[in-house]
Regions:
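Active-site glycine-rich loops that stabilize anionic/oxyanionic intermediates
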Residues: 20-23, 84
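Active-site loop/oxyanion-hole signature of alpha/beta-hydrolase fold enzymes
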Residues: 29, 33-36, 42-81, 243-246
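Gly/Ala-rich beta-loop-alpha elbow adjacent to hydrolase catalytic centers
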Residues: 82, 86, 90
């Protein structure tokens, strides 16, 4: 079963957080802890990420089935926040198993196939000689030769296990399955629960032309934009993201 971290009282409404590509539940620690005064927060590590098991496949049906296993083991019907790849996994989960999901907040991703590639970051991580890395800043410095964005450098090194000098990412499988990650499966189901598609103002991941397919799958879809934020909106504007999540899950009518 997937690894997950929990915050808050089990008696509170459950909220599952699903990270994006190259991330982990731990990346969401600050937001998860802050939301734990209102929710029982479950932050999962998706397959081939963090402390969860590694598998030879990385498709959205498999990821959704992994999430079903966690949800049923906890006997909950959670609200869900899913970012990027995690948002796609959350959408597939809701479309295939609508009775298991309460409300969805999909952060900066649409149920469509994207043409851009994220494999360059895998190659960057592969180029790091981890035998010479003694502290996280060593890896950050080494990554800076291949990844210009400082925030991304720090983000990637959060998935570095210093004790074993290895990545907590199944880079080989993520590379070979990149076509699955960038795509989105055809699903006949619909989700009639409240769903917020929350985009970063500076991001192009949720575009106007995506609304037709979104509305056809998510009957109660709503849209909001976080001003000044890009694709990593929860990291760039954490307080604003947190406040929007609270409003959506507790006071939906404001949207």
């Amino acid at each position: 079963m997937l690894n997950y971290l929990t915050h808050g009282a089990e008696s509170s409404p459950p909220l599952m957080i699903i990270h994006g590509l190259y991330g982990s539940g731990r990346n969401w620690g600050v937001i998860a802890k802050r939301l734990s005064n209102q929710f029982y927060v479950i932050s999962v590590d998706l397959r081939n990420h963090g402390d969860s098991p590694w598998f030879a496949s990385h498709d959205y049906h498999s990821m959704a089935n992994d999430l079903v296993e966690v949800i049923t083991s906890l006997d909950i019907r959670p609200n869900i926040i899913g970012h990027s790849m995690g948002g796609k996994a959350a959408m597939v989960l809701a479309l295939k198993n609508p009775d298991l999901v309460n409300r969805l907040l999909i952060a900066d991703i649409a149920p469509v196939k994207y043409e851009h590639d994220q494999s360059q970051f895998i190659e960057a991580m592969r180029k790091i000689d981890l035998s010479k890395v003694e502290k996280r800043s060593d890896a950050t410095e080494a990554l800076s030769k291949f990844v210009e964005n400082k925030s991304l450098q720090n983000f990637f090194t959060q998935s570095l296990d210093l004790k074993t000098k290895s990545w907590k990412l199944n880079l080989d499988i993520l590379s070979s399955q990149m076509h699955e990650i960038l795509g989105f499966p055809k699903i006949d189901g619909k989700f009639s629960g409240h769903t917020l598609f929350f985009r970063g103002e500076k991001s192009e991941y949720i575009r106007a032309e995506h609304r037709e397919i979104i509305n056809s799958l998510f009957i109660k879809a709503r849209f909001a934009t976080l001003k000044g934020a890009g694709h990593w909106l929860h990291a760039e504007k954490p307080r604003e993201f947190e406040n929007a999540a609270r409003l959506f899950f507790k006071e939906l009518e404001r949207f």
